[in-house]
Amino acid sequence: VGGDGIIVSKNNVQITNLSTVVGGNGGSGGVAGSAGLAGAGGKGGNGGDVPIGSPTTRGKRGEDGAFGENGINGRVGNGGAGGTAINISADGVILLNQGKVLGGTPGSINAQPGEAIVVSGKNSHIINDIGGEIWSSGLNSKAVEYEAGADNGIFEMRTNSIVDGVVDATKISNSKLVLGGNTAKENSTFIASKIGNGRQYQGFSNYEVNTSEGSTWNLIGETTALTPWTVTEGTLAIVSDHSLGSTDGALTLNGGVLQTVLNVNSDRRFNLTAESLNGGILTDGDLTLTNVISGVGGLKKTGNATLILGGQNDYTGRTIISSGNLFLTGEGGIEHSESVELSKGTSLNISSTTGGTMVNNLTGDEGSHVVLGDRFLTVNSLADSVFSGEFGAEGETGGLLKTGAASFTLAGQNNYTGDTTVSAGKLSLSGDSNIEKSGNVRLNRDATLDISATTNGTMVNNLTGDEGSHVVLGDRLLTVNSLADSVFSGEISGNGSLIKKGQGDMTLDGINSYQGITRIDQGNLRINSDQSLGGGNKNNSDLIMNGGGLKIFGSFASDRDVYFNADGDISVDKDMSSSWNKIHTGDYKFTKSGEGELIVRNGGDASEISLMNGALTLINLNMNSEKQDALLNVNNGVLNIIGGDVSAKNDLIYITGDSTINLDNVSIKSSGNGMRLSDNVQSTLSLRNQYTDMPILVEGKNSILNINAGDNTTLASNMHKSDESTINLNLMNNSSNWVISQRTDVDNVRNSGNIIFSPLNKSEFNNLNIKGDYSGGNGTITLNTVLNKGGDKDQQLSDKVLIKGNVSGETVLKVVPQGNGDNTASAPGNIFSSRDGISLVQVGGDAADNAFKLDREYISTGTKSPYQYRLFTYRGDQVDQQSNFLGDKPVNVDFRLQTAYLDSSGNVVPGVDPDYNNSNNENGNGTGNDNGTGNGNGT
């Protein structure tokens, strides 16, 4: 056998070969013997070991061969085997080959060629460096052979190195084949099909790329061998997953780069070590991974092509997308990754996931993208993060779910139309970023939406929030677009303002502290306390009605003013009462609805108000309208006006439903009707501390107006009614006055106050026509009467009270006399006649004799007049129907003024006292009874 070129027997040494090491050549065979004689032995090989039937010696000349047998039995002796170039028997040896290693040549063609390198020691590391060559010496020899027990052996080849012959690691465990390199940037190729049983590289347990940064090993060809590759440094480039061997072998990224040159599909596991982010995956072709990526490391993606992940990955390090696209599909996810970081021009695409996915601590540069499709992305914020890219492309229906206690900031343009839910932590918007296309924005308890860093505020749709949630405005403006009804029970804070848009109702039932205004443009804003509208003072936190409505479902007092920039509605729920400082409607209409009460405490100004329901109290309000419509439209409810000035170009109050109007010390002016009722309405007008001369028109069918004149009231209104409507008047006490200046038709009157006929002239007098009943509550009626002869109807010049119904109670008649007086007694024999005198009150129903009486014994025209007009009562058949002023209703009781005097016996005598003495009548009043008896005869 040829001798070994180098024998390494010392542990843990490093050997560098810069020259050529050749194993000893085997000795040549002996010469064949002649026939019949023994042949001579062959000459020993130089430098090798030649066995000639005896123990070998190294480096010596071979012994002669034994003689051959006689005759034909003679033969040539076999040559010696080639020697090993380098024999490593020690442990921990590093061999750096920068030269040439060649096994020894065999002594004959039948002898064994020598191996280049034989390793029997453990933990060896053979490096075939750039330009290094390792050659076996023949077909059956090996370039490198690891003998049994030489475990943990590493064989590394570098760029432009040569290995000719088999590298056999089949007898050892934990062996590794390394594609290495030095500091130079090189591009090398390794053929995967050389790996496997019967191939050049046999028996390795592990495979590694560990070359210099920037250097690339191109792995081409295919193998079915189990080749679990680890890329530690440098780049491993593939065109097919088959180059990586059986899919049972995982690929580990340990700081190096896996590059896909073409589109590659892989079903193998990937492992990421703590060093993985020093390398990553470079996709020049799309890479689809359907198995799981695991490990404590992170995933860094470069290259313009797409990385597609379909496995339920559980690696825990960062995910960095430096270029290209990361595409998640099916159940694919990266929810265990510490963070997801997108560079400019990159994207995270979840549109093909089964049900959306979750990422932690999402960040993105301007120009990055999150593609949602119709899926929802959950962003779990374990630390504060900012995404400055586009979250959701135009028209995408997916949405955002924010979890985690930290803050997630959207700083780019977001176009997704699905919901935004902040389950925990804070979702912040900054700059021009907004989520105004998101269908709904929901905040869970303790979650926050922060818009304080936006340029000009933002808009959100259908904002909802649990109790304990927060919206932080800073000094910005939040617009809530309510496309559907929503409830926000959290707190809105900051110096900013709130605008409500959209046709849906938005409910604020939390305690808010924002300092700015609240403006309602569309739909309804529902509140239950003044704090629902923030904590600002009335100078900077007013409520502005800009086309929408306010619905109140709580009782509270507010110091805010309410301004109307458009027609608007304020509704108060049943059993609730809400008061405000002032209202300012401008030229717009304010509508009060709901069954509760709304109070305006300190006036303001208004041009048109409609009360649809409930109660509305206006205190010291100035109302002035040039509109043709009514100033106050009352459909239903109670309208209280206390103080202030109210004037209208047309109707002042138009009533279309059952209602009550209470006026107290209001200055009223109307060019049209002061009050007008439509069909089928029952309404009450109550007056207190009030003077009003507004005309009252009850024109509708089946409508009823009840007028209550209370303390310190003067009602000077002209009242008109249709035949099918009703006016009932109640003068409640002796400070209640009703001044009549024209013919007036009413239905029922209760008089505990004063009815006063306004004086006109000697030829014009008015009638009070009462269609129904009259109740006297010790009130008075003041009438203007010309004291003349009377008699015929056209000669009875006086205001009259004409009652078609019944009369109850008592009333005092105060007659304001005109004229010179005359003797009304015209009947022969100087007797009482129901045709004589002047009728003041006619009753179609029943009335007691004392239902009406004068405020004195008699009326005269002056202190020296001989004519004493006394009030007499005629009833039934005694009534002269030719003096009927009731029209189609016969007069049943007629109260008439007639001249009469008391004779010396105290009897009432018709006519004039023939013994009249001026000295008895200095004051024009008698001293006898007020009225005659019921039959018209004096008592």
Regions found by a protein language model. Name each.
Residues 15-20, 208-213, 282-284, 296-307, ...:
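Parallel beta-helix/beta-solenoid
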Residues 912-923, 932-939:
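Outer membrane beta-barrel translocator domains of Type V secretion systems
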Residues 2-11, 86-89, 119, 273-275, ...:
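Extracellular beta-strand-rich solenoid/capping regions of secreted or surface-exposed proteins
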Residues 119-137, 142-148, 171-221, 226-240, ...:
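Extracellular beta-solenoid/beta-roll
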Residues 351-386, 430, 452-489, 493:
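Thr-biased low-complexity repeat/linker tracts and other Thr-enriched repetitive architectures
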Residues 215, 231-236, 256, 303-305, ...:
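Glycine- and acidic-residue-biased ligand/ion/polar-headgroup-sensing regions
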Residues 1-5, 18-87, 98-122, 131-150, ...:
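Glycine-centered low-complexity coil/loop motifs and glycine-rich tracts
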